[in-house]
């Protein structure tokens, strides 16, 4: 049997905190239609992501990719920003 790797998830969001060393907090928003009420709902979630060069500041739009666990809460890495 072959060992097939699944593609890693990629999310886009906005940096809301860059106070910790080599870590940024990224807020990711998603919109979906409620199945019963048919209204669009906006839900946001915060992810701790690894920023090895400390180059992203609050307000930057970034993409994060899933990775191996880096610490207790960090399992995402910042791959690029705008």
Swiss-Prot record:
> Could you tell me the keywords of this UniProt record?
Ribonucleoprotein, Ribosomal protein, RNA-binding, rRNA-binding
Q: Which Pfam families match?
A: Ribosomal_S17
- Is Repeat set as a keyword in this record? no
Annotated TM spans: none
Q: Which CDD domains match?
A: Ribosomal_uS17 (cd00364)
Q: Which superkingdom?
A: Bacteria
Cite a single GO MF annotation.
rRNA binding
Q: What cellular component GO annotations does this protein have?
A: cytosolic small ribosomal subunit
Keyword Ion transport listed: no
Q: Which SUPFAM superfamilies match?
A: Nucleic acid-binding proteins (SSF50249)
Q: Which GO terms describe its biological process?
A: translation
The cross-references to PANTHER family, in alphabetical order and at most eight, read: 40S RIBOSOMAL PROTEIN S11 FAMILY MEMBER, SMALL RIBOSOMAL SUBUNIT PROTEIN US17M
Q: How does it assemble?
A: Part of the 30S ribosomal subunit.
Family per UniProt?
Answer: Belongs to the universal ribosomal protein uS17 family.
What's its job? One of the primary rRNA binding proteins, it binds specifically to the 5'-end of 16S ribosomal RNA.
Q: What is this protein called?
A: Small ribosomal subunit protein uS17
Query: What is the organism of origin for this protein?
Result: Rickettsia africae (strain ESF-5)
Q: What is the lineage of its organism?
A: Bacteria, Pseudomonadati, Pseudomonadota, Alphaproteobacteria, Rickettsiales
Gene name on record? rpsQ
């Amino acid at each position: 049997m072959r060992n097939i790797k699944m593609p890693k998830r990629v999310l886009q969001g906005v940096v809301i905190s860059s106070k910790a060393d080599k870590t940024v907090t990224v807020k990711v928003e998603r919109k979906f239609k409620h199945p019963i009420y048919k209204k669009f709902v906006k839900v946001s979630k915060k992810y701790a992501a690894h920023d090895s060069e400390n180059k992203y500041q609050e307000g930057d739009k970034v993409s994060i990719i899933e990775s191996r666990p880096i610490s207790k809460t960090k399992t995402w890495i910042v791959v690029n920003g705008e």
